[in-house]
Amino acid sequence: MTTWDKCLKKIKKNLSTFEYKTWIKPIHVEQNSNLFTVYCNNEYFKKHIKSKYGNLILSTIQECHGNDLIIEYSNKKFSGEKITEVITAGPQANFFSTTSVEIKDESEDTKVVQEPKISKKSNSKDFSSSQELFGFDEAMLITAKEDEEYSFGLPLKEKYVFDSFVVGDANKIARAAAMQVSINPGKLHNPLFIYGGSGLGKTHLMQAIGNHAREVNPNAKIIYTNSEQFIKDYVNSIRLQDQDEFQRVYRSADILLIDDIQFIAGKEGTAQEFFHTFNALYENGKQIILTSDKYPNEIEGLEERLVSRFGYGLTVSVDMPDLETRIAILLKKAHDLGQKLPNETAAFIAENVRTNVRELEGALNRVLTTSKFNHKDPTIEVAQACLRDVIKIQEKKVKIDNIQKVVADFYRIRVKDLTSNQRSRNIARPRQIAMSLARELTSHSLPEIGNAFGGRDHTTVMHAVKAITKLRQSNTSISDDYELLLDKISR
């Protein structure tokens, strides 16, 4: 057993399985008397191993070999190439000692040419703190089977098409823009940036773009992915020394669709790679479509240069659909499932589930499954029984006085201003927003809502709801405020 074999056993005990397999196992250490040469395969590995594991490697070799040694770090594969850095440890060196560093030679990076697919060699199931180099989250596991062929991106799902997307005031602009870029990619709205809360149809629209663009031009190279997969692709290309292939694939797309782009914020390496990918595609007239749960300027940690580029094209929102659209979504979904759903039952479900489309469809499935299991029609009574917990949660969480307090705090006014007769814009607009929220988030009737706002007529509430619905489509500031308030009130 070599000295390095002994060291590996000790190092393995101090690291997670993922760290050991990702960073330590791939390196090769050659010993020549007191000289230990650490071959790190590429510059990324070398820098990360020196900064992250250098002290651990040094102290472990000292423990197994003795203090009088020299450690050399190379950014090459093991084949006797030039050395980049040398660390000399004398008899007094220990784990916490300051080591001397001598730069002997700066090796030129060697490009590795491989086939379009990459062979993954990791079988990791654990993930620890080795994300510092790339900045990816600890929750993102990069797993693969031995010798599994690796391809980039994610498949488009055939069920996500424009015909199955129910259009309403809350999403009609986004849908129209999505259709335009699927027919004429790279001409208008580049990039197309779609934002909105979870479960409101962003992914549906994005994949519908890809599916329709493929119908229009079967030869178009369309790459769909999400930010998590993009990060995994990038990290794996580095681990497998195949960044050229990563760049070739992503930068040769005719249409690039990336879902949940907000998750690259704070991931320095990935963000930089995406920045260059964006520039390459944009300059070549290729279409870029992105989705996020926030408006670009509100994505915390996102580089300013990316925020600026997202503004090159069109930014549109998808909001929670209004009551009529929610009913239409339920009726279409039931029809697609081959089930009959009475209009009044659809209206009941739509009135009581106002969080997002995903939960709306989940409630429908619950009602249809229960009615089928009990050999009953999906009546309002069945829906009431199925959704009683959902309704209780809604009623428990959302009350008009709570809405008034949250809105007043948000706009830094008093609750009594909302119920007063003041008509100044800084009071009237928040009052309209609060009324619209009360209509959307509670089961109170229009007269009840009007009464809670200083005894106003139900027609005033109707006007407020229509005004805010229209403003959310044309005024980004109002739309953003409304979404933030929805989130605050629903917590």
From Swiss-Prot:
Subunit structure: Oligomerizes as a right-handed, spiral filament on DNA at oriC.
Database matches in PANTHER family: CHROMOSOMAL REPLICATION INITIATOR PROTEIN DNAA
Keyword Nucleotidyltransferase: no
SMART domains (alphabetical): AAA, Bac_DnaA_C
Protein's GO biological process: DNA replication initiation; regulation of DNA replication
The family this protein is said to belong to: Belongs to the DnaA family.
Location of this chain's protein in the cell: Cytoplasm
Organism: Francisella tularensis subsp. tularensis (strain SCHU S4 / Schu 4)
Pfam families per record: Bac_DnaA (PF00308), Bac_DnaA_C (PF08299), DnaA_N (PF11638)
GO CC aspect terms: cytoplasm; plasma membrane
Record's comment describing the protein's domains: Domain I is involved in oligomerization and binding regulators, domain II is flexibile and of varying length in different bacteria, domain III forms the AAA+ region, while domain IV binds dsDNA.
Domain II: annotated segments: 69-154
Protein name (database record): Chromosomal replication initiator protein DnaA
Region of interest (Domain IV, binds dsDNA), residue spans: 372-491
A GO molecular-function descriptor: ATP hydrolysis activity
Residues that hold ATP according to the record: G199, G201, K202, T203
Region annotated Domain I, interacts with DnaA modulators, chain positions: 1-69
NCBIfam families attached to this UniProt entry: DnaA (TIGR00362)
Keywords: ATP-binding, Cytoplasm, DNA replication, DNA-binding, Lipid-binding, Nucleotide-binding
Statement: the UniProt record of this protein carries the keyword Cytoplasm: yes
Domain III, AAA+ region: annotated span: 155-371
Family matches, as PROSITE patterns: DNAA
Record's function text: Plays an essential role in the initiation and regulation of chromosomal replication. ATP-DnaA binds to the origin of replication (oriC) to initiate formation of the DNA replication initiation complex once per cell cycle. Binds the DnaA box (a 9 base pair repeat at the origin) and separates the double-stranded (ds)DNA. Forms a right-handed helical filament on oriC DNA; dsDNA binds to the exterior of the filament while single-stranded (ss)DNA is stabiized in the filament's interior.
